[in-house]
Amino acid sequence: MIYQLMDNCNVIVSQSYEYDKLLELKSLRKFISILNEKLNSNFVYYIFWGEISDEQYLLSKTEKIDQSCHNILFWIGDEKGCIPSDETFQRFDFIFKVHLKDKDAIRTENGINVYRKGLYHFPLLTIDDVPELPVLSFEDRKYNLYYCGNLNKNRLPLYLSLKKKPQIKELITNFLLHNNLRGGDKLFNLCFKGKTFDFSNYYKNSYVKFYSGFNNGDNYKTYAHFLQNSKIVLSPKGFYSTECFRFYEAMRQGCIVITEELPHVECYQDAPCITVKSWKQLPDILINIDLYNTFSPSIIRKFYDDKLSINGIAQYVYNRILSI
């Protein structure tokens, strides 16, 4: 279906999704409004919510696109970060797409990925229903460490790094999954499916919980409260990508984010966060008392405002368009 978000902006939702469940719709509306203030009226925007397997649906809905305008596509929702077809590139002047991978870059310049002509990384924004709260100093925050999220297979290494004494079957599960061996999925479901794990008592003044299933943890207001009151927030990989809303929302609240390696794209360059190659590094990081001297909520929040906020992302898109 096609929905008109603004006079010069249409949202195309693939058949496997629902418009009303678009988590960042208000943010996208504000983002387009800012772009309209910066660019002239000859720009037309298309926001596509779908997987790469839905690409033909996108093409069918844009067959009669007005080629006399500058047509810009913002492709969201494809966590696998696949590269569009040549037909899509021929139809749009610029394509900004979420979750683009390092491996698909044709080269790097000054540490930033360069993709094929007309293709640019698009940051994630934040979920509309997660409230933005005042940024507190570290001294005023109750929790040293916070994580509440789904325990998917990619997050098992994080689970094991947090658990003081993992069970043998959990270690075997991780070995099988890591080496893509038969039986790993079955053992994972046996050990973890439908279960909740609370490690809050393992670490002083912390709230650390794993649950089963997407979006089954804290409600958005509670989640925002924990972000506001936490010094360190863990941001593990989702089902396919290390980029996630949690990273943006935690940075917005001035938290020290510990994340797996993010793609080499402009919005993450020099981000004031901690990047781990392996979650085995986590225990040593958590006992580092110099963390709170290295980072500050104000520095983290400033980076968010400059690079990850709606205004920051709009400025990035504007700069990319003007550079061509």
Question: Regions from the language model: what does each represent?
Answer:
Residues 110-111, 285, 289:
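A signal for specific C-terminal beta-sheet/loop modules enriched in small/flexible residues
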